[in-house]
Amino acid sequence: MNETIQNLITRRSVRSYSNKRIPDDVLDQILDAGSYAPSGMNKQSAVMVVLRDRDRISDISFLNAKVMGTDSDPFYGAPVVVVVFADSRVPTYVEDGSLVMGNLMNAAHALGVDSCWIHRAREVFSTPVGKDIMKKWGLDENYVGIGNCILGYSDKPVPDAKSRKGGNVIFEHH
């Protein structure tokens, strides 16, 4: 099987991380792949904010948990969080940001790094506190949170994929 196809099929969402640091060169490759995601009319509306500082990750985790209505860590102890935003003035901003998220996760897997898409970025960064954080990052109110891509190395064996349910491909017959 083609290596790229195999990578797409074997990627899994990981929700338990060790403290092992992702080497800078590996993280740079993942982020570079994210920046090359397709975008509508090549507008490249998405922006990635990379968090490696434990305190900053904890701050954003707390806000995310608050939106979710829990006090558990929605980032599962991951040592890196990439918050993806996109400019809502671009008609395809949600799709653009989503493709960045996909590229980040697939590139991470190709390099032996685990990942998971964590939702609620839109809700977190719609709050007054979230908007203040965005301002500190140089993002104005036109940017909308698309997702949080957590990255790191699993502290448990990663399970194999569950079988696909089927019926998700329909061929038109003439």
What residues fall within each predicted segment?
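Acidic, surface-exposed loops and disordered segments
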Residues: M1-H174
